[in-house]
Regions:
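Exposed, interaction-prone extracellular/peripheral surfaces
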Residues: 2-41, 54-59, 68, 73-114, ...
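Short glycine-rich loop/turn motifs that provide flexible caps or phosphate-binding loops at active sites
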Residues: 44
Length: 322
Protein backbone atom coordinates (compact mmCIF):
# COMPACT_ATOMS: atom_id res chain seq x y z
CA UNK A 1 0.00 0.00 0.00
CA UNK A 2 2.88 2.36 0.84
CA UNK A 3 4.52 1.76 -2.50
CA UNK A 4 1.28 2.46 -4.35
CA UNK A 5 0.74 5.76 -2.55
CA UNK A 6 4.36 6.76 -3.19
CA UNK A 7 3.90 6.05 -6.88
CA UNK A 8 0.65 8.02 -6.93
CA UNK A 9 2.36 10.99 -5.28
CA UNK A 10 5.18 10.81 -7.83
CA UNK A 11 2.89 10.92 -10.84
CA UNK A 12 0.87 13.75 -9.30
CA UNK A 13 4.05 15.78 -8.87
CA UNK A 14 4.81 15.24 -12.55
CA UNK A 15 1.33 16.37 -13.50
CA UNK A 16 1.58 19.49 -11.34
CA UNK A 17 4.89 20.35 -13.00
CA UNK A 18 3.48 19.79 -16.48
CA UNK A 19 1.98 23.24 -16.95
CA UNK A 20 5.07 25.00 -15.60
CA UNK A 21 7.59 23.04 -17.67
CA UNK A 22 5.74 23.72 -20.93
CA UNK A 23 6.31 27.26 -22.10
CA UNK A 24 3.25 29.33 -22.96
CA UNK A 25 3.93 29.30 -26.73
CA UNK A 26 4.25 25.52 -26.54
CA UNK A 27 0.95 25.23 -24.71
CA UNK A 28 -0.72 27.64 -27.10
CA UNK A 29 0.55 25.80 -30.16
CA UNK A 30 0.32 22.23 -28.96
CA UNK A 31 -3.03 22.03 -27.28
CA UNK A 32 -5.08 22.79 -30.33
CA UNK A 33 -8.58 22.00 -29.11
CA UNK A 34 -7.44 22.76 -25.57
CA UNK A 35 -7.30 26.50 -26.16
CA UNK A 36 -8.22 28.42 -23.08
CA UNK A 37 -8.04 32.21 -23.00
CA UNK A 38 -6.97 33.06 -26.53
CA UNK A 39 -7.67 35.59 -29.27
CA UNK A 40 -11.17 35.14 -30.63
CA UNK A 41 -11.62 34.77 -34.36
CA UNK A 42 -14.88 36.68 -34.14
CA UNK A 43 -14.85 40.28 -35.28
CA UNK A 44 -15.35 43.37 -33.15
CA UNK A 45 -13.76 42.18 -29.94
CA UNK A 46 -12.77 44.33 -26.99
CA UNK A 47 -8.98 44.20 -26.68
CA UNK A 48 -6.09 44.92 -29.07
CA UNK A 49 -6.89 46.88 -32.22
CA UNK A 50 -6.60 44.67 -35.30
CA UNK A 51 -7.83 47.02 -38.03
CA UNK A 52 -9.26 50.53 -38.52
CA UNK A 53 -11.23 51.53 -41.58
CA UNK A 54 -13.76 54.21 -42.56
CA UNK A 55 -17.42 53.54 -41.94
CA UNK A 56 -19.22 52.21 -45.01
CA UNK A 57 -22.92 51.81 -45.83
CA UNK A 58 -24.08 48.51 -44.41
CA UNK A 59 -21.86 48.64 -41.30
CA UNK A 60 -23.64 48.58 -37.96
CA UNK A 61 -23.60 51.92 -36.17
CA UNK A 62 -22.59 50.23 -32.91
CA UNK A 63 -19.30 49.21 -34.54
CA UNK A 64 -18.21 52.86 -34.80
CA UNK A 65 -15.42 53.87 -32.42
CA UNK A 66 -16.27 57.48 -31.62
CA UNK A 67 -12.90 58.48 -30.16
CA UNK A 68 -11.09 57.24 -33.25
CA UNK A 69 -13.74 58.90 -35.41
CA UNK A 70 -13.20 62.24 -33.63
CA UNK A 71 -9.45 62.07 -34.23
CA UNK A 72 -9.94 61.31 -37.91
CA UNK A 73 -12.81 63.71 -38.51
CA UNK A 74 -15.01 60.96 -40.00
CA UNK A 75 -16.82 57.83 -38.73
CA UNK A 76 -14.35 54.97 -38.27
CA UNK A 77 -15.01 51.29 -37.65
CA UNK A 78 -12.48 49.51 -35.44
CA UNK A 79 -11.88 45.77 -35.48
CA UNK A 80 -10.55 44.56 -32.15
CA UNK A 81 -9.15 41.32 -30.91
CA UNK A 82 -10.92 39.84 -27.93
CA UNK A 83 -10.10 37.05 -25.54
CA UNK A 84 -12.41 34.06 -25.20
CA UNK A 85 -12.31 31.11 -22.85
CA UNK A 86 -13.00 27.54 -23.91
CA UNK A 87 -14.91 24.95 -21.91
CA UNK A 88 -13.72 21.42 -21.25
CA UNK A 89 -16.20 18.72 -20.27
CA UNK A 90 -14.54 15.86 -18.38
CA UNK A 91 -16.77 12.79 -18.31
CA UNK A 92 -15.64 10.08 -15.88
CA UNK A 93 -16.97 6.51 -15.95
CA UNK A 94 -17.48 5.59 -12.28
CA UNK A 95 -19.03 2.14 -12.73
CA UNK A 96 -17.66 -0.72 -10.62
CA UNK A 97 -15.96 -2.09 -13.74
CA UNK A 98 -13.44 0.72 -13.26
CA UNK A 99 -12.09 -1.07 -10.18
CA UNK A 100 -10.33 -3.51 -12.51
CA UNK A 101 -6.59 -3.85 -11.95
CA UNK A 102 -3.84 -2.69 -14.30
CA UNK A 103 -0.34 -4.09 -14.75
CA UNK A 104 1.04 -1.37 -12.50
CA UNK A 105 -1.15 -2.47 -9.59
CA UNK A 106 -3.36 0.59 -9.96
CA UNK A 107 -7.08 0.38 -10.51
CA UNK A 108 -8.45 1.55 -13.83
CA UNK A 109 -10.23 4.52 -12.25
CA UNK A 110 -6.94 5.75 -10.76
CA UNK A 111 -5.24 5.76 -14.16
CA UNK A 112 -8.27 7.43 -15.75
CA UNK A 113 -8.37 10.09 -13.04
CA UNK A 114 -4.70 10.89 -13.56
CA UNK A 115 -5.41 11.27 -17.26
CA UNK A 116 -8.06 13.86 -16.43
CA UNK A 117 -5.59 15.65 -14.15
CA UNK A 118 -3.16 15.98 -17.05
CA UNK A 119 -5.79 17.69 -19.18
CA UNK A 120 -6.83 19.88 -16.26
CA UNK A 121 -3.25 21.02 -15.59
CA UNK A 122 -2.88 22.52 -19.05
CA UNK A 123 -6.50 23.56 -19.49
CA UNK A 124 -6.50 25.59 -16.26
CA UNK A 125 -3.20 27.17 -17.27
CA UNK A 126 -5.10 28.44 -20.29
CA UNK A 127 -7.97 29.67 -18.09
CA UNK A 128 -10.42 27.11 -19.46
CA UNK A 129 -13.73 26.48 -17.73
CA UNK A 130 -13.90 22.84 -16.60
CA UNK A 131 -17.04 20.82 -15.97
CA UNK A 132 -16.62 17.42 -14.27
CA UNK A 133 -19.30 14.76 -14.72
CA UNK A 134 -19.31 11.32 -13.01
CA UNK A 135 -21.70 8.58 -14.09
CA UNK A 136 -22.72 5.03 -13.23
CA UNK A 137 -25.97 3.08 -13.55
CA UNK A 138 -27.42 4.79 -10.47
CA UNK A 139 -26.79 8.43 -11.30
CA UNK A 140 -25.12 11.04 -13.47
CA UNK A 141 -23.65 13.84 -11.37
CA UNK A 142 -22.16 17.12 -12.49
CA UNK A 143 -19.66 18.06 -9.80
CA UNK A 144 -19.36 21.82 -9.16
CA UNK A 145 -15.82 23.14 -9.62
CA UNK A 146 -14.30 26.60 -9.38
CA UNK A 147 -10.66 27.44 -8.83
CA UNK A 148 -7.19 26.31 -9.83
CA UNK A 149 -5.51 22.95 -10.27
CA UNK A 150 -5.23 22.21 -6.55
CA UNK A 151 -8.97 22.76 -6.19
CA UNK A 152 -9.60 20.51 -9.18
CA UNK A 153 -7.57 17.72 -7.60
CA UNK A 154 -9.49 18.08 -4.36
CA UNK A 155 -12.82 18.09 -6.19
CA UNK A 156 -11.91 15.01 -8.24
CA UNK A 157 -10.63 13.12 -5.19
CA UNK A 158 -13.85 13.83 -3.32
CA UNK A 159 -15.97 12.80 -6.29
CA UNK A 160 -14.14 9.46 -6.50
CA UNK A 161 -14.56 8.64 -2.81
CA UNK A 162 -17.42 6.23 -3.44
CA UNK A 163 -18.29 2.56 -2.78
CA UNK A 164 -18.03 1.64 -6.49
CA UNK A 165 -20.93 -0.79 -6.19
CA UNK A 166 -22.96 0.27 -9.23
CA UNK A 167 -22.40 -0.96 -12.77
CA UNK A 168 -21.42 1.46 -15.51
CA UNK A 169 -23.91 3.07 -17.86
CA UNK A 170 -21.87 4.20 -20.83
CA UNK A 171 -24.93 4.79 -23.00
CA UNK A 172 -26.29 7.36 -20.54
CA UNK A 173 -22.89 9.07 -20.24
CA UNK A 174 -22.54 9.35 -24.02
CA UNK A 175 -26.10 10.63 -24.29
CA UNK A 176 -25.15 13.34 -21.78
CA UNK A 177 -22.17 14.25 -23.97
CA UNK A 178 -24.37 14.32 -27.06
CA UNK A 179 -26.63 16.91 -25.42
CA UNK A 180 -23.81 19.39 -24.70
CA UNK A 181 -24.88 22.40 -26.73
CA UNK A 182 -21.56 24.28 -26.92
CA UNK A 183 -20.00 22.97 -30.11
CA UNK A 184 -16.66 24.57 -29.30
CA UNK A 185 -16.36 22.64 -26.03
CA UNK A 186 -13.81 19.85 -25.76
CA UNK A 187 -15.16 16.54 -24.44
CA UNK A 188 -12.74 14.25 -22.57
CA UNK A 189 -14.18 10.80 -21.87
CA UNK A 190 -12.33 8.60 -19.34
CA UNK A 191 -13.14 4.88 -19.20
CA UNK A 192 -11.54 1.47 -19.65
CA UNK A 193 -11.09 -0.62 -22.78
CA UNK A 194 -14.07 -2.88 -22.11
CA UNK A 195 -16.69 -0.10 -22.11
CA UNK A 196 -16.95 0.78 -25.79
CA UNK A 197 -18.74 -1.53 -28.20
CA UNK A 198 -20.34 -0.90 -31.58
CA UNK A 199 -23.46 0.85 -30.16
CA UNK A 200 -21.26 3.24 -28.19
CA UNK A 201 -18.99 3.88 -31.18
CA UNK A 202 -22.02 4.86 -33.25
CA UNK A 203 -22.97 7.46 -30.64
CA UNK A 204 -19.39 8.70 -30.46
CA UNK A 205 -19.33 9.22 -34.21
CA UNK A 206 -22.36 11.47 -33.80
CA UNK A 207 -20.67 13.43 -31.01
CA UNK A 208 -17.46 13.80 -33.02
CA UNK A 209 -19.35 15.59 -35.79
CA UNK A 210 -20.13 18.48 -33.46
CA UNK A 211 -17.42 18.44 -30.78
CA UNK A 212 -13.69 17.87 -30.49
CA UNK A 213 -13.33 14.69 -28.44
CA UNK A 214 -10.58 12.82 -26.58
CA UNK A 215 -10.99 9.31 -25.18
CA UNK A 216 -8.81 8.21 -22.25
CA UNK A 217 -8.76 4.42 -22.65
CA UNK A 218 -7.30 2.45 -19.72
CA UNK A 219 -5.91 -1.02 -20.48
CA UNK A 220 -6.39 -3.47 -17.63
CA UNK A 221 -4.26 -6.49 -16.80
CA UNK A 222 -4.20 -9.65 -18.86
CA UNK A 223 -5.40 -12.30 -16.37
CA UNK A 224 -3.30 -15.02 -18.00
CA UNK A 225 -0.03 -13.26 -17.23
CA UNK A 226 -0.87 -12.18 -13.67
CA UNK A 227 1.13 -14.99 -12.07
CA UNK A 228 1.74 -13.33 -8.74
CA UNK A 229 -1.86 -12.27 -8.17
CA UNK A 230 -5.11 -14.17 -8.00
CA UNK A 231 -7.42 -12.77 -10.65
CA UNK A 232 -11.17 -12.72 -10.05
CA UNK A 233 -14.12 -11.58 -12.11
CA UNK A 234 -15.37 -8.18 -10.94
CA UNK A 235 -19.06 -9.11 -11.17
CA UNK A 236 -19.12 -12.69 -9.84
CA UNK A 237 -15.95 -12.85 -7.75
CA UNK A 238 -14.97 -16.14 -9.40
CA UNK A 239 -11.23 -16.75 -9.58
CA UNK A 240 -9.39 -17.83 -12.68
CA UNK A 241 -8.31 -21.51 -12.38
CA UNK A 242 -4.54 -21.94 -12.32
CA UNK A 243 -4.66 -24.63 -15.00
CA UNK A 244 -5.90 -22.07 -17.52
CA UNK A 245 -2.96 -19.74 -16.99
CA UNK A 246 -0.61 -20.48 -19.87
CA UNK A 247 1.21 -18.71 -22.68
CA UNK A 248 -1.31 -19.71 -25.34
CA UNK A 249 -4.24 -18.17 -23.48
CA UNK A 250 -2.23 -15.04 -22.72
CA UNK A 251 -1.30 -14.64 -26.38
CA UNK A 252 -4.88 -15.09 -27.54
CA UNK A 253 -6.13 -12.42 -25.13
CA UNK A 254 -3.37 -10.04 -26.20
CA UNK A 255 -4.15 -10.57 -29.88
CA UNK A 256 -7.88 -10.07 -29.42
CA UNK A 257 -7.52 -6.94 -27.35
CA UNK A 258 -4.89 -5.47 -29.65
CA UNK A 259 -7.36 -5.90 -32.51
CA UNK A 260 -10.14 -4.21 -30.53
CA UNK A 261 -7.80 -1.35 -29.58
CA UNK A 262 -6.76 -0.84 -33.20
CA UNK A 263 -10.41 -0.87 -34.27
CA UNK A 264 -11.29 1.73 -31.64
CA UNK A 265 -8.40 3.95 -32.68
CA UNK A 266 -9.38 3.72 -36.34
CA UNK A 267 -13.00 4.58 -35.53
CA UNK A 268 -12.01 7.60 -33.46
CA UNK A 269 -9.48 8.79 -35.99
CA UNK A 270 -12.05 8.59 -38.78
CA UNK A 271 -14.27 10.92 -36.79
CA UNK A 272 -11.47 13.34 -35.95
CA UNK A 273 -11.26 12.30 -32.30
CA UNK A 274 -8.20 11.37 -30.26
CA UNK A 275 -7.40 8.14 -28.43
CA UNK A 276 -5.05 8.11 -25.45
CA UNK A 277 -4.51 4.51 -24.35
CA UNK A 278 -2.26 3.31 -21.53
CA UNK A 279 -2.00 0.64 -18.86
CA UNK A 280 -0.62 2.79 -16.03
CA UNK A 281 -0.43 6.40 -14.90
CA UNK A 282 3.24 6.59 -15.91
CA UNK A 283 2.41 5.27 -19.37
CA UNK A 284 -0.54 7.66 -19.61
CA UNK A 285 1.76 10.57 -18.75
CA UNK A 286 4.21 9.57 -21.50
CA UNK A 287 1.36 9.14 -23.97
CA UNK A 288 -0.07 12.54 -23.07
CA UNK A 289 3.26 14.34 -23.46
CA UNK A 290 3.95 12.52 -26.74
CA UNK A 291 0.52 13.45 -28.08
CA UNK A 292 0.99 17.11 -27.16
CA UNK A 293 4.52 17.15 -28.60
CA UNK A 294 3.45 15.76 -31.96
CA UNK A 295 0.51 18.15 -32.06
CA UNK A 296 3.00 20.95 -31.38
CA UNK A 297 5.01 19.96 -34.42
CA UNK A 298 1.95 19.78 -36.66
CA UNK A 299 -0.17 22.76 -35.65
CA UNK A 300 2.48 25.47 -35.79
CA UNK A 301 1.40 28.77 -34.26
CA UNK A 302 -2.25 28.46 -35.22
CA UNK A 303 -4.72 29.11 -32.43
CA UNK A 304 -7.53 27.36 -34.23
CA UNK A 305 -8.58 23.93 -32.95
CA UNK A 306 -6.53 21.21 -34.56
CA UNK A 307 -6.85 17.45 -34.62
CA UNK A 308 -4.44 15.89 -32.15
CA UNK A 309 -2.32 13.03 -33.43
CA UNK A 310 -3.27 9.68 -31.96
CA UNK A 311 -0.78 8.09 -29.61
CA UNK A 312 -1.24 4.69 -28.05
CA UNK A 313 0.75 2.94 -25.37
CA UNK A 314 1.79 -0.13 -27.35
CA UNK A 315 3.20 -1.80 -24.27
CA UNK A 316 -0.11 -1.55 -22.43
CA UNK A 317 -2.10 -4.78 -22.31
CA UNK A 318 -5.72 -5.25 -21.48
CA UNK A 319 -7.18 -7.64 -18.99
CA UNK A 320 -9.88 -8.67 -16.57
CA UNK A 321 -10.52 -7.63 -13.03
CA UNK A 322 -8.22 -8.44 -10.15
Amino acid sequence: MTGRMTGDDAIRRKIEALATTLTLPTVKRALGTLEGEHPSHRRFGSDDIMDIRPYEPGDEARRIDWRTSARNGRPMVVHRQRQVTSRVWMLMDTGREMTGSCESGEMAWQVAANGLRMFAALSLRRSDDISLVCADSASITRVPFHGGFAQFEHTLDRALERPWNHARNMDALLDYARRISDRNALIVLATDEHALGEPQLATMRTIARTHPMVVIDVATINPFVARRRAVADADTGRRLPALLINAVSASEVDTHRSYLAAQLEAELQAGGSTLMRASSSEAMFRTFVHTVSISLARTGFSTRPATVVHARDTAGKAGDRA
